[in-house]
Amino acid sequence: MKPREVTKLKMSVRTARKRNTIVAVTLMLTILAPMSAMAAPAPMNNSNLTYETAKKTVIEKAKLLTEAYGTTSLQYALIDGGEITVSGQTGKNDLNDKVPLTTNTIYGIGSTSKMMLTAAVMKLVDEGKIDLDVPVVNYMPDFTMKDKRYKQITPRMLLNHSAGLLGTSSGSAILYGDNDTYAHDTFLDQLATQNLMAEPGAYSVYSNDGFTLAEILVERVTGMSFTAFIHKYFTEPLKMNHTKTPQDIVNTGEMAGIYSPLYKGQLPHENYNIIASGGIYSTAKDLVKFSQIFTGEVKGILSNKSVEAMEQKEYRRGMWPEDSDSSMSYGLGWDSVDLFPFSAYGIKAVTKGGDTLSYHSSLVVLPEYNMAAAVISSGGASITNQFIASELLLSALEEKGIIKERKPEKSFGVPVKADMPKEISKFAGIYGGNNSVTKIKINKAGQMTVSSLTAPSNPVQEYTYTSDGTFVSDDGTEKLKFVVEKNGNTYLWSRSYISVPGLGQVAFSEYNAEKLKANTLPKEINAAWAKRDGKKYYLVNAKYTSMLYLNATSILPIQLNKENPGYMSNNKITGANAAANLLQIPGTAGRDTMDIHFSKKNGGEYLTFSGYVFASEEMVKPIYSGKRSATIIQADGYAKWFSVPATAKGKVMTVKLPANGAFAIYDQNGICINHSVVSGKNVVVLPENGRIVFAGEVGSQFEISLKK
């Protein structure tokens, strides 16, 4: 689950409690001890079980997701002892309801793809072709980075998120109906220009790039494409007939329909072209078939030794908060190897979730009981799918008599105020994490407030100091503590229990922010950044089929905050044209860091990070408001941006498109009102003070005509 989803989930649930409604939670989700009585793990005869409780429960909760929590459609399956005992689907597929959902409807599974990559690496470990603890450069001599510590990175570090890579290099990877391999093919070139965020192995922080590098490692060692490898060794032996990648021939009519609040119709097919990181397509039934590798039901694919190695507490190899109930505790590939609430019953559960812009998935496996559940969806979020998957398994465990009764939901209780030591006040200040900046105030009475500088409209959160040295929220759902780690940095440790009406409860425990150190800038550097404050920069190097054009992430505002001088968001300004993200936070709060650079070219300023290039607003010229004009994509391949002057407002623009090009139009609020790849429309009324982007291959010409 992405960190922003966790943060929004916490805030939304609290707001919902205050309002006594699930509406606040719905808004967020549409964005995003030993047990009392437990039998010893052993195979059971399931012939007399009906799974009626599980079936009834999943139908009710799946209906709730599609009716109240923003999920368009979802599909689910439960496997027990090698038999798929529960499966189904609900929701809307196509707009006209002409194509029904079935158990064979194919969905993207996002980062759950990482488990297939991890299994691929471990198979090569079984064969003696890869050693988890031998540097990657031994297998790939052409793998280089700007930061020379890259030579320490091992395959294990790629799979447990501890390699220290910056995060996600996904330029032109997420496309509509386009399986272009550019992001994969140029990935090593991108890494060659990057630094590391930390010493390899220092701590585990979620990294898509680690798995993309591991994908290429598999290809180099085997001489096969990743797609060919997983089909030969996993999907074919397991009869996962509906599991594909963007490099396969996929019948788009078999794919679940995807939608966006920004467009009224059904969107084109989504291709996530860094495959091992998040690009595999599958069904819930196929995913639970795949889970049999991890329950031992299927032999000859992975050794027991490799399966057990994947389930070890890899997160404990580096910096991490003390163990507590959580949904995040990395193994090899797995998001958690000790998933709550199963841990409360003394049951080992491992899980992996995934989210793309359109699709979401959750796979939960109980290795000791030969059981697994998978839930995948169009719309929604992986965390809500995890609720359903967990409920499927808990209901089945009840019916089997393994769980005698459900445990009550957990809470830290209403805080009882205690006298706060004076030295605690020193922890007040500005904290960075989750791609956001937070201000923490602590008064002498032991009251702490947490407010967002990044999103000032968010409500201020209040906490009370208690006798165990922690601050607890008024509703008892979250406990915060300041921790000074061995590296000298101060972290805000958050433990929380989040209950979502009608769905269940999840737990989180992580460092969610790091205290930012003061950064006083010389006058000339401060002046250079002050000129950028409030400006907008426009994406110019995304392919014309990119999904980013619709989602308005193609327009980037620069916003500095007077309360956080010397920083751009949580990036420390290191020069007139550079800002580095120096945060070192394990888990998810420190993921996807980026070093930002500015440069002058063609009479304008460009901003670059993570492979993306943005042009300053000075380079956006008014579109010609006469009857006819044209624009051509130049040799650099950069998209051409234009503004809508008052003389063109309200006019009808018709664009004659080249074979390999598209355009998008945005209103004055930066909302996309037409992306030609999505709508198929080349005629649009120009909005007041809007923006237009033309993108395509080098030499592509767009012929433009305007009329009243």
Regions found by a protein language model. Name each.
Residues 6-24:
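Bacterial N-terminal signal peptides that target proteins for export
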Residues 47-109, 129-131, 138, 146, ...:
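Short, conserved catalytic-motif segment at the N-terminal edge
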Residues 83, 92-94, 148-357, 361-362:
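Short, surface-exposed loop or secondary-structure junction motifs
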Residues 56-62, 76, 82, 106-136, ...:
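Active-site SXXK
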Residues 40-84, 231, 270-708:
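Catalytic loop of the DD-peptidase/beta-lactamase superfamily, centered on the K-T-G motif
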Residues 2, 83-84, 129, 260, ...:
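Residue-level signal for well-ordered, solvent-exposed loop/turn and beta-edge residues enriched
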Residues 35-39:
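Sec/Tat signal peptide C-region and signal peptidase I cleavage site
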Residues 24-34:
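Bacterial N-terminal signal peptides
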